[in-house]
């Protein structure tokens, strides 16, 4: 119900003020981020795997969404093709694009490392449970 109410609120507020562009942007942004939340929910609730593997998938979803969700929203709203993470420069923390890219890269690499560790732990646990 919360997802439905989110979209109804966006439609009502923007429709009341005749802000069609705001409604489009709001619905796109809400869809992109609600999709991540629903993927995490379905993984945690319905995936038939142990907790380590579920956690690994959740970490991957969260890190990929953190790294690329803004670029996806920019493309869907404005048609701008950009991959912020391509601007990674760990020696430059002064420009906004480099700071964003550096943070996205750190989150993405950290998420992949953590998820890999969790996948290995999940595999070990699954193998140990089969014996």
PLM ranges: what are they?
Residues 1-12, 33-39, 111-118:
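Hydrophobic alpha-helical transmembrane segments of integral membrane proteins
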